[in-house]
Amino acid sequence: GVDSELVFDETRSKANLYATIGTTDSPGVMLSGHTDVVPVDGQDWHTDPFSLVSRDGCFYARGSADMKGFIACVLAQVPEMTRRSLRTSAHIALSYDEEVGCLGVRRLIELMTTLPVQPMMAVIGEPTGMQVVRAHKGKQAFRVTVRGRSSHSAYPTEGVNAVDTASGLVAYIRQLQQNIRVHGPFDDAYTVPNTTLHVGTIQGGTALNIVPEKCVLEFEIRHLPEQDVDRLVADIRGHIATVLEPPMQAVDPDTGIEIEVLTSYPGLSTQTDAAVVGLVQSLLGDTEGTQKISFGSEAGIFTGELGIPAVVCGPGSIQQAHRADEYVSEEQLDRCIRFMSKLTDSLVDGIAFP
């Protein structure tokens, strides 16, 4: 049978699912994915993005690669898992709102902390071309609100220009990025071998002849797992407090800068000799070694919060995710289905955990 529980959000309009096939009082292997997808607004799709279309050996739809293909392969294996007697349990963890900051998984973590035993390892099925990924970067995202004072643009010294102040912060973030690009730290196993800082949005001002009273920008840091990201954030906060705010508040003490954390999740760095790495590689017949990726996943959260060793491995390519005509190939799904079948055999035989 399947022992399952739904963990709803505050509105009860969406939920996480945690299910166990086998016994709930012994450690097992967790298969995890997120059920939400990114919007299709403004994208030039050639098929209905919310109707699955099979063409030329590929399946087209929003979320086909990221990451409903993996979830479909997992669910397709459930009848076989329930039919056979598993010596090692299988756990299925499906989350909501991963795409907007890994929000749903936090509630799932709360449930899992109450379980009698934790999974001994986890496979998160983000699209990796069925390659074994043992490490990924972490991410912190922020919204900065600059509160200035408006005035007629003919008398700019009577106001505090919020856009001008925000541009100073953008310049400082760019300076930090340039310093990291030159001095590191580096890890050449990543496509982008260093921590990156990126200003993605900025809005400010109401008219050309008005000194802008408000400016809002958003930036992110995608950091190597081993890098002290808190120090980077402290540098930015320190620059705001010591360089940017004093001249503003000399004109008007009610002006200032607020910084809000939008998203924060840790990086993943699973050792090459971890049991989960060896198991997944052996089931795939993988002799090419492991990978590291610059995008993030919930794997880092499961490891960081619960201590569950994890890898990322799933069908499809991240290059197809989040764009028009997203697809996953039939060949990739076949590889994932074969992996699930071999995993089931291993669960029936029993997996010896170190």
Give the predicted meaning of each segment:
Residues 56-59, 64-65, 69-175, 193, ...:
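Fold-level recognition of mixed alpha/beta catalytic cores in primary-metabolism enzymes, strongest
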Residues 1-60, 83-86, 307, 317:
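Acidic/His- and Gly-rich active-site-bordering loop/insert found
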Residues 143-354:
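Metal-dependent amide/peptide-bond hydrolase catalytic core
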Residues 5, 29-31, 93, 123, ...:
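Hydrophobic/aromatic beta-strand patches that form the interior of the parallel beta-sheet core
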